[in-house]
């Protein structure tokens, strides 16, 4: 194998964009560019979701339509599930990954918008403020922490399966106390996922996988918000 031409040394950028290298091992310039992309995409996703939810809440005709069409939320949820699998498979294919990202975010925003129409505006605002505050605090904590949070991944996913199973059983054994406990447990679980995914985007992903990083954090935010909605609603009923 021929030696590389000394006139054209391999750049650090080439090294950083090898899929085997993590963001944390890249140069400061690459790390900052990666974080800007991730959090810019995430901000746009949250903005689209917020605007869509506001439209659904503001217009009475829209609320009435979605309440009379319960199949809509299932359609949006299944569509977003299909697109997220397509995104994972095509996350390195630009610009296809961005088109899939937009489609996924739009369907997820529509799903959230339908859900919030069943809640009081005051509770929605409380959940939104809490979600924003918690996400910002956990992000700052994780990015400056020297701890290795990757070891918590298996436990978090095991707890997620337990939460999903408990949510299924809730349909057969519903109680207000159970709803309160599951909502609180779900909110705490996704706080854990925010820490885990923030740590993972720096230590497990390559600099080109910013779309995957944004999706992970977006789903964490949405799930935290929805569980806080349920929790606050359950508390207000007590």
UniProtKB/Swiss-Prot annotation:
The keyword DNA-binding does not apply. It is a multi-pass membrane protein. One of its GO terms (biological process) is regulation of calcium-mediated signaling. Keywords: Apoptosis, Golgi apparatus, Membrane, Transmembrane, Transmembrane helix. Residues 1-38, 90-97, 142-151, 197-208, 230-238 are cytoplasmic. Its main location: Golgi. It comes from Homo sapiens. Belongs to the BI1 family. LFG subfamily. The gene is TMBIM4. The chain crosses the membrane at residues 39-59, 69-89, 98-118, 121-141, 152-172, 176-196. Anti-apoptotic protein which can inhibit apoptosis induced by intrinsic and extrinsic apoptotic stimuli. Can modulate both capacitative Ca2+ entry and inositol 1,4,5-trisphosphate (IP3)-mediated Ca2+ release. This is Protein lifeguard 4. Residues 60-68, 119-120, 173-175 are lumenal. It holds the Pfam family Bax1-I. Signal peptide: none annotated. It is found in: Golgi apparatus membrane. GO terms for molecular function: calcium channel activity. GO terms for cellular component: endoplasmic reticulum membrane; Golgi membrane; Golgi stack; membrane. Residues 209-229 dip into the membrane without crossing it. InterPro entries: Bax_inhibitor_1-related (IPR006214). Interacts with ITPR3.
């Amino acid at each position: 194998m021929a030696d590389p031409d000394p006139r054209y040394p391999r750049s650090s950028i080439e090294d950083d964009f090898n899929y085997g290298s993590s963001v944390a091992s890249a140069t400061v310039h690459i790390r900052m560019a990666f974080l800007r992309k991730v959090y810019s995409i995430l901000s746009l996703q949250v903005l689209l979701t917020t605007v869509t939810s506001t439209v659904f809440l503001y217009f009475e005709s829209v609320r009435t339509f979605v309440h009379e069409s319960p199949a809509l939320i299932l359609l949006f949820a299944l569509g977003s599930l299909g697109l997220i699998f397509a995104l994972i498979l095509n996350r390195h294919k630009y610009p296809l990954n961005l088109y899939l990202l937009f489609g996924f975010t739009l369907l997820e925003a529509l799903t959230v918008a339908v859900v919030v129409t069943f809640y009081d505006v005051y509770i929605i605002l409380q959940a939104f403020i809490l979600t924003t505050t918690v996400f910002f605090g956990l992000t700052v904590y994780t990015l400056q922490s020297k701890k290795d949070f990757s070891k918590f991944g298996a436990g978090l996913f095991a707890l997620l399966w337990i939460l999903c199973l408990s949510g299924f059983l809730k349909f057969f054994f519903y109680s207000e106390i159970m709803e309160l406990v599951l909502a609180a447990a779900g909110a705490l679980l996704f706080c854990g996922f925010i820490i885990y995914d923030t740590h993972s985007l720096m230590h497990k992903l390559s600099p080109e996988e910013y779309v995957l990083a944004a999706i992970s954090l977006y789903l964490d935010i949405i799930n935290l918000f929805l569980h806080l909605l349920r929790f606050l609603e359950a508390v207000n009923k007590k």
